[in-house]
């Protein structure tokens, strides 16, 4: 199997808007404080982000976090399955559950790590994301809201994938922990944009390729 895939170095990004799929599914404090308890996944995305910014791209980052219920009906169904009384389930509680999975804390931490502003969109492909993506300039970075807030994300809905792709000119896949999922933001968008991998995926593929082609011995293979 060929593990040499095209990366961001193989495509021109200067002056272009780049949709970057990251894996910002980071653990949060369980007290609802919005504190990130481990930021290594954010740090893992920095080399690709910094490369794009240094090469004058306008970066539109996106990621999922957790397993939110994108509609109130889905929320009620899920909570009912857990044994909750439907009469106690309100839209206010549903919206609170969404707020707890917002990427706003990620934007704040990413801003600290980059030493520059990270613009936060209030939605994924809605009016706010569209307006901010359209206004984004080279050297700036925009973070879309949790992709799983869109009900079409986990279904790889072509309409959602096309809407996300319309925000940019190039797609960079760098969410190694999520690339096995055929979702709109990980698979579908690649049908509408030139697509390459980021440095995190490149690194992981090199490790996998080396382990298969020339493994260090003795070795133990664990399959699950």
Predicted feature locations:
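Active-site loop-to-helix "anion-binding N-cap" substructures in soluble metabolic enzymes
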Residues: 1-224
């Amino acid at each position: 199997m060929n593990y040499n895939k095209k990366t961001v170095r193989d495509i021109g990004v200067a002056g272009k808007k780049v949709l970057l799929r990251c894996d910002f599914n980071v653990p949060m404090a369980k007290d609802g404080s919005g504190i990130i308890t481990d930021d290594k996944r954010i740090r893992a995305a920095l080399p690709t982000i910094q490369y794009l910014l240094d090469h004058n791209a306008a970066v539109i980052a996106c990621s999922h976090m957790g397993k939110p219920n994108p509609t109130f009906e889905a929320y009620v169904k899920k909570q009912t399955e857990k044994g909750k009384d439907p009469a106690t389930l309100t839209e206010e509680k549903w919206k609170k559950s969404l707020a707890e999975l917002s990427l706003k804390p990620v934007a704040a931490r990413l801003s600290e790590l980059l030493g520059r502003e990270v613009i936060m969109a209030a939605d994924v492909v809605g009016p706010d994301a569209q307006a901010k993506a359209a206004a984004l300039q080279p050297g700036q970075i925009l973070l879309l809201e949790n992709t799983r807030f869109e009900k079409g994300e986990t279904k790889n809905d072509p309409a959602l994938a096309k809407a996300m792709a319309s925000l940019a000119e190039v797609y960079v896949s760098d969410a190694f922990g999520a690339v096995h999922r055929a979702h709109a933001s990980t698979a579908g968008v690649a049908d509408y944009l030139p697509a390459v991998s980021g440095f995190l995926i490149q690194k992981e593929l090199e490790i996998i390729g080396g382990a298969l082609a020339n493994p260090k011995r003795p070795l133990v293979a664990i399959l699950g």
